[in-house]
Amino acid sequence: MTFLAIDVGNTRLKWALYDAPRAGAALRAHGVEFLDHIDRLAEGSWARLPPPGHMLGCVVAGDAVKRRVQEQMEIWDVTPSWVVASAQEAGLSNGYDHPSRLGADRWVAMIGARQHVLARGPARPLVLVMVGTAVTVECVDAQGRFIGGLILPGHGIMLRALESGTAGLHVPTGEVRLFPTNTSDALTSGGTYAIAGAVERMVQHVIAHCGTEPICLMTGGAGWKVAPSMTRPFELLENLIFDGLLEIAMRRLAAA
């Protein structure tokens, strides 16, 4: 039974078709579409896919976008299913004040990250950084409890805020430098170091709270830009949200 995983972010939709709804399943096809173009999926890349037997996704872009995606899925006889954060799922417990208000992408990515940690050896605390339109920093203890996290503006949001509120800052994208000597590099370095500083603060909080060094993971389209500026090594992982969706789907089907 093939499995379609869908991740609808703030700017893009990513999808992946696997040979089964289980962790470690073989990838058969995948793609990315900007949200402006998702109404073409049924006549484009999805038209060439074998009908999926099961589907699970997460969406942060809102109900209107979700409805557009579901309309494209009408070419198949498959029921759309979307993850909503809950108090507990797939071995992860949710410490948010109101669990259902935690972003589905954050919840699913943490589930994928937790399984990645457990596959490597004994359970350890985890710091997960997702770098996209926004940046999130998630902290999970060794028992699998999400203990809290941060939401920061991503690079693009930071730069647009500065450009709209400050005269003379419409400059090309710069490079990250130790000591920037031009405005482009100063803006890029400032945004990167702001993210790196927030991440390091949360790592220190986890060490103090859990009494041990966490495993540090990073994902998201812009992760490769930020990772080199971290104060400690971060492992870059490409498909944590898909990994989380596979884990959730496998467990839900087994319990059905």
From Swiss-Prot:
Binding-site residues, ATP: 7-14, 133
Ligand binding (substrate): 96, 103-106, 183
SUPFAM superfamilies with a match to the protein in the record: Actin-like ATPase domain
EC number, as in UniProt: 2.7.1.33
GO cellular component terms given for this protein: cytoplasm
Pfam assignment, any one: Pan_kinase
Coiled-coil features, chain-numbered ranges: none
Stated name of the protein: Type III pantothenate kinase
Organism whose genome encodes this protein: Verminephrobacter eiseniae (strain EF01-2)
Gene: coaX
